[in-house]
């Protein structure tokens, strides 16, 4: 989780933050009777506290996709996040956007198989090629669950709000190049990777 403050442009103060979610997904293997197995999963972990940056975005949890044989596909996941901003008393408008940065999971073996994760915000696809508007007070977009930010962007204190993206597996390959149309043809195993979403906040004076 990182926060980066960009320089001023005219009278606009623009800040971006990148929310990084580590993702694991896998296909299950049926076990025969009287066979036992044990596995140990280890997570690398860090802890961070940041209550001073102009914009802080924190993912609230991780993502885990499971293959379901009955639908020949993977389940979708709701990924919650927390947004905190510092108010600017000189601001007359506020805008918050998001953009997909990375979304590829790679299988943890020699197959090279990949899965791509799609990100959706309130019915709008979060893409790499353009910004998804989450708040735009100048045009009456007040952010739904993020509305406390639309109301507090020009306050003298910090304001927080929580919302979520919907994550789903939208495409895959068997070897990194050959696309699959039927997920049941994917190799067995576990895919791992990061889904990164960049948030940009602009205070206009």
Swiss-Prot record:
InterPro entries referenced in this protein's UniProt entry, alphabetically: EcpA (IPR016514), Fimbrillin_EcpA_sf (IPR038478)
Signal sequence region: 1-32
Keywords, in A-Z order: Fimbrium, Signal
Stretches of the chain forming a coiled coil according to its record: none
Subcellular localization: Fimbrium
Keyword Protease: no
One annotated Gene Ontology cellular component of this protein: pilus
Keyword Endoplasmic reticulum recorded: no
Signals that turn on the gene: Negatively regulated by H-NS. Positively regulated by IHF and EcpR.
The protein's assembly and partners: Self-associates. Forms filaments. Interacts with EcpD.
Family: Belongs to the EcpA/MatB fimbrillin family.
Protein name, UniProt field: Common pilus major fimbrillin subunit EcpA
Gene source species: Escherichia coli (strain UTI89 / UPEC)
Gene name tied to this protein: ecpA
């Amino acid at each position: 989780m990182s926060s980066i403050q960009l320089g001023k442009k005219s009278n606009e103060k623009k800040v971006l933050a990148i929310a990084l979610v580590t993702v694991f997904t896998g296909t299950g293997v049926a076990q025969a009777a009287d066979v036992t197995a044990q596995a140990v999963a280890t997570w690398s972990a860090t802890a961070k506290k940041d209550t001073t940056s102009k914009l802080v975005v924190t993912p609230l949890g991780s993502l885990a996709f499971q293959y379901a044989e009955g639908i020949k596909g993977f389940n979708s996941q709701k990924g919650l996040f927390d947004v905190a901003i510092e108010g600017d008393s000189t601001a007359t408008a506020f805008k918050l956007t998001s953009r997909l940065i990375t979304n590829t999971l790679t299988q943890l073996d020699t197959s090279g198989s990949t899965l791509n994760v799609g990100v959706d915000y309130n019915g709008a696809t979060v893409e790499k090629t353009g910004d998804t508007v989450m708040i735009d007070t100048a045009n009456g977009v007040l952010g739904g669950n993020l509305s406390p930010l639309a109301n507090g962007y020009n306050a003298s204190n910090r304001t927080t709000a929580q919302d979520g993206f919907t994550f789903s597996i939208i495409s895959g390959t068997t070897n990194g190049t050959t696309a699959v149309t039927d997920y049941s043809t994917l190799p067995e195993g576990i895919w791992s990777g990061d889904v990164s979403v960049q948030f940009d906040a602009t205070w206009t004076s």
